[in-house]
Amino acid sequence: REILSAEMIHRACLDAGLDSRYIFIVDSMDPLRRVYSFLSPEYERYIGCPLAFIPAPDSNGNPDPEAGSYADHFLTPFLEALGQIGVFPEVIMNHETYSNGEFAAKIHSTIEQADAIREIIESISGRELDENWFPYKPLGSDGSMDGVTVTGYENPFVHWTDRHGKSGSADIRKADGKLPWRIDWAARWGIHGVTCEPAGKDHGAAGGSFDTGLPIC
């Protein structure tokens, strides 16, 4: 429904003679959260890895390196279905926005104001963040965001150690990691000039990501 709500607003703006740009941001930098029922156990190794960087499943649910990315695998039929009803948004892959450096300034600003952002999230959401919380999630040696601890920051590099005992540095100008959702969403508003965005009611609930996003943005 969010897609069609945005389409209706976009068309109404154009009909009224206003400038309107309708973009659809694909959460391709988001991690695989678990092995779903249609996936083989082989996907266990990809938990925590960005959807853009893991292989699509074949007909048996096994990772197929020749079939493109997991993100594209599920995005393609969705866009085809939208096209059948005349909806053609401008598609933006979020991992590409990270990889081309558009997030860099937002990430740097976020890290510099980490304490203030922690206070915003905790006071508005009513939940306490972990003592090791850091407003940027770098990818570890296995490509996963899970089990990675930030050890320092020297712009543009976030230094880390992971669950395998390995250390490294993530370049905030590349897709070496991502902002947590509540911060990522707010950053997109500024990067893409978003002025209107339909969203699920959970985001708009008291203490939700919209409430924390406004002061962060």
Please give the residue ranges for each predicted region.
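N-terminal Rossmann-like or analogous alpha/beta NTP/dinucleotide-binding catalytic cores
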Residues: 1-118, 207, 211-217
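Alpha-helical recognition segments enriched in aromatics with Gly/Pro capping
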Residues: 113-119, 123-217
